[in-house]
Design a protein with these regions (language model features):
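Membrane-cytosol interface at the C-terminal ends of specific transmembrane alpha-helices
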Residues: 47-89, 114-115
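Interhelical loop and adjacent transmembrane-helix boundary motif
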Residues: 123, 129-172
Length: 184
């Protein structure tokens, strides 16, 4: 598992623009292969099918933010010990019941924190979103950037403030969870 964590953390260490290019190149080649095959098989020109779609954007987010989610969930998995599984098995529970009654309640806070942290990172991600977004698909970060670029700073304040407020709420939630866990 440490090797997977180290490999996944590369996405967070590499700039978003580099990840965007790293996603665009293979998707462009795949688009060209699909377009050639569809033109040969069906006789229609399709153009780009994957590049500039939400699927490409989600893939870039997955590469970029896997480390955030993986480390948070890994911390939750550390709470589950083999003795818990042994105890559940000795009480006659099936593996599915053990998952539902033991693992899921212990992992729920970590999964919620991971989802929240990834949501906040997606909300503020600009370089990969800017390069890979479909036309007329503006996130808060892109809207704030476009308004600030046009020197409409008063208008750029609203989307920027929403990004900061959501980030602050996430930090407060995770901090509260951390202090509750250390007290118990």
């Amino acid at each position: 598992m440490p090797a997977i964590n180290r490999f996944a953390s590369l996405g967070y260490a590499i700039p978003g623009a580099v990840i965007a290019v790293g996603v665009l190149v293979p998707l462009g080649r795949l688009d060209n292969l699909l377009a050639g095959w569809l033109e040969q098989a069906l006789g229609t020109k399709t153009g780009l099918l994957l590049t500039g779609t939400v699927a490409a954007l989600v893939y870039a987010y997955l590469v970029r933010l896997l480390a955030v989610a993986l480390q948070t969930v890994d911390a939750g998995l550390a709470k589950i010990t083999p003795s818990m599984d042994d105890a559940a098995r000795s009480l006659g529970t099936s593996p599915i019941q053990t998952l539902a009654r033991v693992h899921a309640p212990l992992l729920a806070p970590s999964l919620a924190a991971a989802a929240l942290l990834v949501f906040v990172d997606v909300l503020k991600e600009l370089p990969a979103t800017f390069a890979l977004r479909p036309f007329n698909f503006d996130t808060l970060a892109i809207e704030a950037y476009n308004l600030a670029k046009d020197e409409r700073l008063a208008e750029a304040a609203a989307p920027s403030l929403v990004i900061v407020a959501v980030g602050l709420l996430a930090v407060l939630f995770v901090t509260k969870r951390y202090f509750q866990a250390t007290r118990s």
